[in-house]
Amino acid sequence: MSDSKVNMVSPPEGLTGEGFFATKLNDVVGLARANSLWPLPFATSCCGIEFMATMAAHYDLARFGSERVSFSPRQADMLLVMGTISKKMAPILRQVYEQMSEPRWVIAVGACASSGGVFDTYSVLQGIDKVIPVDVYVPGCPPRPEQIVDGVMRLQELVKSESVRRRSSPEYQELLASYNIS
């Protein structure tokens, strides 16, 4: 075995002392994105009431970086779809999703958004993943605020580990193409 010697490089002049570390750009960007998600609530039913409780002082979703709830798709990067989505509402949901800028993430909150819930009828969309890609599913009818917080935390983990280049990858473009989203 050879003795390898590590060459320590001295920092540039004026940049000495504590507080410097080396990391990857993906990690820094992922950490920043994960802790500054701006939610856009798309609520149609009782899950929206649970989301209101989640944003209130007792559960305080703001402590996870979702301080500012946006009601403009152009200023949001996390779409929370809550409640029953009718088939007539599906094109509107898709339009809202398309108006969001990249990177954008989707959480399906509750049984109705995830799978249509108990409403297995001709007029109800059986899961929003039929019209837009979903990143995290939160189960429940309606889910408790703790479950919604857990869903946001799971999304944060996904965002932290996502590569900066993922959104321009052929796989991601293929996923969007499968939904006819350009």
Curated annotation (Swiss-Prot):
NDH-1 shuttles electrons from NADH, via FMN and iron-sulfur (Fe-S) centers, to quinones in the respiratory chain. The immediate electron acceptor for the enzyme in this species is believed to be a menaquinone. Couples the redox reaction to proton translocation (for every two electrons transferred, four hydrogen ions are translocated across the cytoplasmic membrane), and thus conserves the redox energy in a proton gradient. NDH-1 is composed of 14 different subunits. Subunits NuoB, C, D, E, F, and G constitute the peripheral sector of the complex. The keyword Ligase does not apply. [4Fe-4S] cluster binds at C46, C47, C112, C141. It comes from Flavobacterium johnsoniae (strain ATCC 17061 / DSM 2064 / JCM 8514 / BCRC 14874 / CCUG 350202 / NBRC 14942 / NCIMB 11054 / UW101). This is NADH-quinone oxidoreductase subunit B. It catalyses: a quinone + NADH + 5 H(+)(in) = a quinol + NAD(+) + 4 H(+)(out). It is found in: Cell inner membrane. The gene is nuoB.
